[in-house]
């Protein structure tokens, strides 16, 4: 998937830091700890301690997407760490809303999990998504992603 970018200027995120890892940030009066990563598109990762399945993503997702910190808007991954090799993720994609899967988002979430010390670089990390599991491996050189392809739709378009 390429090299993970942590430099805020390249994400882009308007914060004067070398990187944004576990950084306190307030959105709509609530403080979150955020980690920002670019996988060729901007991601903001938020680790959740509570019930990720009942998170009101339709409510909080747009607030992150359109926050002034992100001049090009942002994809936001809400992540619960299950163990040091497994995370569960829900994603709010800029311009689309909640989606069942996002490859670059899963990569960003795994990178953030390593940068925050929840997982280890070089280890396979399973990212559990509504649309299925992906396995991510983050190294200093690149981020690898593997997963199953599954047919979900077939149709015909007349032109």
What are these regions (language model features)?
Residues 1-100, 111-159:
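Active-site proximal loop and beta-alpha junction motif in alpha/beta enzyme cores
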